[in-house]
Regions:
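Alpha-helical subdomain
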Residues: 1-173
Length: 173
């Protein structure tokens, strides 16, 4: 969006993670390896294979060897498949049914099913192996008390989805 401050410094790059090289797509879009970079991969990790995500992390790490980078991503917790009750707030009715509905609707809306789910430890490991350290890892439950509570819009426990994590990681220096 042009109304963003410093939008001239923002480049959106599309990539088919299964068939294209992220490095090639970024370099073709004018990526400058000498400048600090913020990468954003929100709503992507659940749609691509774990191998594609790991490969993406490796490419970003190699691209930014000579400078710093920040990586923002979201991931869907593996508990959605393993224990849906833990992904929803206390008192949430029929969590298994809701988990299946969410996966079904996301596949229909995006035209692709969710195929990759992660534990926090797995994401931390992948980031660490590729030169990043997590600075923040939050769920809607965390954001509820931080942002909604102070303005009187706190979500009740049975309205909270804890399935998606929002992560900020920074390249290790």
């Amino acid at each position: 969006p042009k109304e963003l401050p410093n939008s001239e410094n923002v480049t959106y790059v599309t990539v088919d993670f299964a068939h294209q090289s992220l490095t090639e797509r970024l370099l073709n879009a004018g990526f400058d390896r000498t400048k600090s970079t913020v990468f954003t991969l929100e709503g992507v990790t659940q749609y691509i294979s774990k191998e594609a995500f790991n490969s993406t992390m490796k490419e970003m790490s190699r691209l930014c060897q000579k400078t710093s980078s920040i990586f923002a991503l979201s991931f869907v917790n593996e508990l959605l498949n393993k224990n849906p009750e833990d992904c929803f707030g206390r008192g949430y009715l029929n969590p298994e049914k809701k988990a299946n509905l969410i996966k079904k609707l996301s596949a229909k809306a995006a035209g692709e099913p969710w195929i990759s789910f992660y534990s926090t430890e797995e994401i931390e490991g992948l980031l660490s192996e590729n030169g990043y350290s997590i600075k923040e890892n939050v769920t809607l439950e965390d954001l509820n008390s931080l942002y909604f509570g102070p303005v009187g819009r706190t979500l009740s426990e049975n309205e909270i989805f804890k399935l998606e994590h929002f992560v900020i990681a920074e390249s290790k220096e």
